[in-house]
């Protein structure tokens, strides 16, 4: 009985870590730049991402420093 309970707990722990990591880690090498602006609105800190996937990946991995898409193309 203890072994079964332990096994269930381990499986739940593994499932939690696997489900929590939904961030895209591999993006294509296509260069279709997008300009992002910090979610706080500081336009002087705009940043060009290689593509939409790069911006999405950054936002997923950096919850406290996210960017909103400002426009397609490089930031000027």
UniProtKB/Swiss-Prot annotation:
The keyword Protease does not apply. GO terms for biological process: vasodilation. Coiled coil: none annotated. Expressed by the salivary gland. Residues 1-21 form the signal peptide. One of its GO terms (molecular function) is toxin activity. It comes from the Eukaryota. It is found in: Secreted. InterPro entries: Kazal_dom, Kazal_dom_sf. Residues 22-76 form the Kazal-like domain. Disulfide bonds join 23-60, 27-53, 35-75. Keywords: Calcium channel impairing toxin, Disulfide bond, Ion channel impairing toxin, Secreted, Signal, Toxin, Vasoactive, Vasodilator, Voltage-gated calcium channel impairing toxin. One of its GO terms (cellular component) is extracellular region. The keyword Zinc-finger does not apply. Vasodilator protein that inhibits vasoconstriction of isolated rat femoral artery induced by phenylephrine. Since platelet aggregation and vasoconstriction are key hemostatic responses, particularly in small wounds, this protein likely participates in the antihemostatic responses during blood feeding. Blocks L-type calcium channels (Cav1/CACNA1) in left ventricular myocytes isolated from rat hearts. This is Vasotab-TY2. It comes from Tabanus yao.
């Amino acid at each position: 009985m203890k072994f079964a309970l332990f096994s269930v707990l381990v499986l739940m722990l593994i499932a939690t870590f696997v489900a929590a990591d939904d961030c895209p880690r591999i993006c294509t090498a296509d260069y279709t730049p997008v300009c992002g602006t910090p979610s706080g609105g500081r336009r002087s800190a705009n940043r060009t991402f290689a593509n939409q996937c790069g911006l999405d990946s950054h936002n997923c991995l950096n919850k406290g420093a996210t960017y909103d898409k400002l426009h397609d193309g490089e930031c000027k």
